[in-house]
Amino acid sequence: GLGDVYKRQEVIGRNSANYVKYDPSYIYNSGLQTFGILRNPQLFELIYATSKHLHAQPQKYKSEDEDTANDSEEKNGLYQFCSFPVVDYDFTKACTIALTKEDKAFIVDHISKAKACQGTLLKYIVEHKELPLAKEFPGIDENLLPDELRIMQKRAQQFADFMYVVHLRYNCIYSEKNGIRDEKMFEKFSIEHDRFKHSGINIDDVLDMVTLRENSSKMFCREVAACLASDKIAELDDCIIRRERRVKGTRRKIGNQAYSYDPKYPVHNYKLSFRWETVRAFVDELRGKEASNG
């Protein structure tokens, strides 16, 4: 029943009572375009054009035993703006939100063929059902990956480690400027800072694989990495403070009396996982028992 859906840690029905930060339609629309299911971003214009085209055609009549709702049917001269799966339109049958064999084939086919998915870890995971996945990022034994993906995963892990050190230092500054110095946070930073210095991470190699919206983000990362490597903590703090002021403006927290540091809720006190938990839940559903409508 629906009660069981709420308890499942799956893509559909997961944490259903939680507040949604982003409009789901925005997220789904982006995903549909990425996987080539939605073939054009101008969806509403395409729907209007399709509707106008269909209404301009002579009315066709079908007998009662003919299929009257076949989304995959090609319309002459009509652009198919969306790729549709095979759907059973007999709504008198019992149905489920679990994936059917046809659903899975449709999803795998689109991920395998989508331009944005070529050379990605997601495509490799979907196409290799035998690949064991761990619950936490990085999630896959690097020895089981081809060289390009192994390096990509390693760089992602290094970027997560690097940003964790930066976030720890941010909280150190925030606690000192907006409340009481958080000694535990300073201890954490000291440990992770030392670990970073001995990790051999080359920030330029890492940034070569990171997609950032603007060059100033990469410049910030390089400046921070240099400060961490040379133990220039005062310069590091200044760099972080300037970055927040430039990006957040009046919404900045450091030095802003409208905010106070709470040691129970530090800012970004976690390592980036690149939404691995969602990927794992999605793949578990894809590999799980197939449902059948009816």
Question: What is each of the regions a protein language model found here?
Answer:
Residues 30-35, 109, 123, 127, ...:
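Short, hydrophobic/amphipathic alpha-helical patches that form generic packing surfaces
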Residues 18-35, 40-46:
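Short amphipathic alpha-helical interaction segments
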Residues 2-6:
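Short, small-residue-biased leader/transition segments that mark boundaries at the very start
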Residues 43-68:
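Short, cationic-aromatic polyanion-contact patches
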Residues 1, 33, 40, 134-137:
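Mature, well-folded catalytic/scaffold domains that follow N-terminal targeting or propeptide regions
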Residues 61-141:
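Leucine-rich, amphipathic alpha-helical/linker segments
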Residues 8-22:
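Short helix-coil junctions and helix-kink-helix linkers
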Residues 1, 147-294:
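Long, contiguous all-alpha helical interaction modules
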